């Protein structure tokens, strides 16, 4: 299954004009089936949206404001780091947020959020029926009347205390989750590969047509430091083609330190891998960004093993990893280290503890870049204004 997922991902990220010259016969044999599925996907999307527009499917309204964080394409767009960033904005303002997430893929993202937000009043509700999950949390903790809490000072330095009651809901991967009404739609775009091959799933990476950008209230271009000025301009042009007035912000996933597998309470500075022999192992949506960031830290050599997004490491995978580490040790006459992301570690931490090699976990956090007149404060102001527009009339 993992091999099939990798094949489909390679097709989805390859321009059709290059298929014949770059893809293997096995890849090419899948294209007719994927094309058929993709042609059926669009009318299914339209039909579903039409059911909501006609009221045949009901859109549920929560008693608190809802911030949706989603994307137009799958994989590596920084949704979960942005969810955490927004949650911290509200926590710092004294408003306990409720994060609503599906929790698929071994719940690696849920575990990471739980660790990062531990000790804060943020709550994490997990399940496909996020309206029902939210209802359970509202009954358990209560909620704050938004007209009394989300005023102009909410995201400023003058904090208010709301106890344990929920003041806002943050919808993780919410763009296609039409069941919940939202106050603000934040759309994440991966600057390194923004639109894949411009085709719909499963032949491409698009979960909706480009016209869906019209629904965006805010667009965040993630991994913005890894794209050229021309690439950033091309992304801006595409976004503004469908949504002329939408504000665009830029973010990065900034590394802070490493933790050691087997002793995660011990942190290591980033400089610890300078001049080291490394094997980067990941099962995330944007492995290239991970490897490039490791390269910037100055190791002597970087090798990589990529698995499909959310892949759970099995014993056979550990054997492959161990053999690659043995080879690196033989080639360089030095003991290599393995580096993984937090998502990979939290998916199955126990399988990484007995490799016989040191395993480091790269810890990072999302930051809004000061770029093109936008920065973290202007993003918070934009968020605040949208919540005021929709809830405080």
Positions of PLM-derived features:
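Short, flexible loop segments at boundaries between secondary-structure elements
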Residues: 254-256, 308-312, 355-389
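Phosphate/Mg2+-binding loops and adjacent switch elements
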Residues: 102-250
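Residue-level signal for inorganic ion chemistry
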Residues: 40, 80, 113, 172, ...
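C-terminal accessory "lid"/substrate-recognition subdomains
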Residues: 1-26, 194-335, 389-393
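A transmembrane-helix-recognition feature enriched in membrane-embedded lipid enzymes
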Residues: 3-65, 374, 386-391
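Walker A (P-loop) phosphate-binding motif
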Residues: 49-105, 225-226, 393
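Short helix-loop-beta junction
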Residues: 92, 115-120, 294-302
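Acidic beta-strand-to-loop metal/phosphate-binding motif
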Residues: 335-343
């Amino acid at each position: 299954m993992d091999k099939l997922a990798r094949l489909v991902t390679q097709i989805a990220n390859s321009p059709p004009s290059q298929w014949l010259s770059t893809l293997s016969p096995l890849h090419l044999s899948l294209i007719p089936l994927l094309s058929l599925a993709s042609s059926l996907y669009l009318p299914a999307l339209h039909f579903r949206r039409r059911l909501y527009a006609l009221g045949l499917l009901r859109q549920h309204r929560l008693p608190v404001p809802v911030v949706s964080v989603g994307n137009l394409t799958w994989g590596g767009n920084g949704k979960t780091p942005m969810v955490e960033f927004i949650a911290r904005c509200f926590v710092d303002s004294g408003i306990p947020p409720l994060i609503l997430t599906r929790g698929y893929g071994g719940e690696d993202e849920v575990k990471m959020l739980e660790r990062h937000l531990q000790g804060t009043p943020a709550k994490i509700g997990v399940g496909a029926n996020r309206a029902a999950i939210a209802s359970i949390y509202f009954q358990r903790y209560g909620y704050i009347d938004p007209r009394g809490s989300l005023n102009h000072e909410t995201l400023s330095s003058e904090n208010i205390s709301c106890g344990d009651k929920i003041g806002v809901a943050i919808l993780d991967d919410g763009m296609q989750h039409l069941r919940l009404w939202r106050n603000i739609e934040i759309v994440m775009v991966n600057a390194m590969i923004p639109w894949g091959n411009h085709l719909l799933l499963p032949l491409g990476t698009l979960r909706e047509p480009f016209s869906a950008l019209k629904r965006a209230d805010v667009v965040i271009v993630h991994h913005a430091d890894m794209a050229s000025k021309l690439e950033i301009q091309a992304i801006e042009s595409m976004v503004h083609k469908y949504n002329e007035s939408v504000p665009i912000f830029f973010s990065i996933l900034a590394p802070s330190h490493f933790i050691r597998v087997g002793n995660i309470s011990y942190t290591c500075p980033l400089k610890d891998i300078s001049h080291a022999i490394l094997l980067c192992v990941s099962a995330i949506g944007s492995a290239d960004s991970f490897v490039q960031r490791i390269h910037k830290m100055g190791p002597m050599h970087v090798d990589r093993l990529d698995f499909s997004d959310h892949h759970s490491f099995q014993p056979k995978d550990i054997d492959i990893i161990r053999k690659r580490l043995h080879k690196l040790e033989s080639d360089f006459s030095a003991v290599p280290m393995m580096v993984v992301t937090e998502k990979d570690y939290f998916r199955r931490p126990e399988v990484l503890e007995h490799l016989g090699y040191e395993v480091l976990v790269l810890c990072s956090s999302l930051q809004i870049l000061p770029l093109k007149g936008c920065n973290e404060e202007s993003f918070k102001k934009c968020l605040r204004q949208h919540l005021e527009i929709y809830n405080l009339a």
